[in-house]
Amino acid sequence: MQPLQILAIVALVVAGIIAIIVWSIVLIEYRKILRQRKIDRLIDKIRERAEDSGNESEGDQEELSALVERGHLAPWDINDL
């Protein structure tokens, strides 16, 4: 094999590894965004019910606390919301 062919193969492998890493990071961030949207919707729902009825919904509070107590999606990420 010529050095140019070896270099091309190595470059493709490196590009593939970088693509996998980037898409993994994108997926982790997307999951965080979806989780935060779900938490925001539950908070809004609790606020609406509190305004309407004068008390808060126990089921929504339990679901919200379960989401918040779930922990980190990525254990190496210490900047959690």
From Swiss-Prot:
Its main location: host cell. Gene3D superfamilies: HIV-1 VPU cytoplasmic domain. The keyword 4Fe-4S does not apply. Ion channel activity is inhibited by hexamethylene amiloride in vitro. The modification Phosphoserine is found at S53, S57. Phosphorylated by host CK2. This phosphorylation is necessary for interaction with human BTRC and degradation of CD4. It holds the Pfam family Vpu. Residues 29-81 are cytoplasmic. It is a single-pass type I membrane protein. HIV-1 lineages are divided in three main groups, M (for Major), O (for Outlier), and N (for New, or Non-M, Non-O). The vast majority of strains found worldwide belong to the group M. Group O seems to be endemic to and largely confined to Cameroon and neighboring countries in West Central Africa, where these viruses represent a small minority of HIV-1 strains. The group N is represented by a limited number of isolates from Cameroonian persons. The group M is further subdivided in 9 clades or subtypes (A to D, F to H, J and K). The N-terminus and transmembrane domains are required for self-oligomerization and proper virion budding, whereas the cytoplasmic domain is required for CD4 degradation. The cytoplasmic domain is composed of 2 amphipathic alpha helix that form a U-shape. Belongs to the HIV-1 VPU protein family. Enhances virion budding by targeting host CD4 and Tetherin/BST2 to proteasome degradation. Degradation of CD4 prevents any unwanted premature interactions between viral Env and its host receptor CD4 in the endoplasmic reticulum. Degradation of antiretroviral protein Tetherin/BST2 is important for virion budding, as BST2 tethers new viral particles to the host cell membrane. Mechanistically, Vpu bridges either CD4 or BST2 to BTRC, a substrate recognition subunit of the Skp1/Cullin/F-box protein E3 ubiquitin ligase, induces their ubiquitination and subsequent proteasomal degradation. Homopentamer. Interacts with host CD4 and BRTC; these interactions induce proteasomal degradation of CD4. Interacts with host BST2; this interaction leads to the degradation of host BST2. Interacts with host FBXW11. Interacts with host AP1M1; this interaction plays a role in the mistrafficking and subsequent degradation of host BST2. Interacts with host RANBP2; this interaction allows Vpu to down-regulate host BLM sumoylation. This is Protein Vpu. It comes from Human immunodeficiency virus type 1 group M subtype B (isolate JRCSF) (HIV-1).
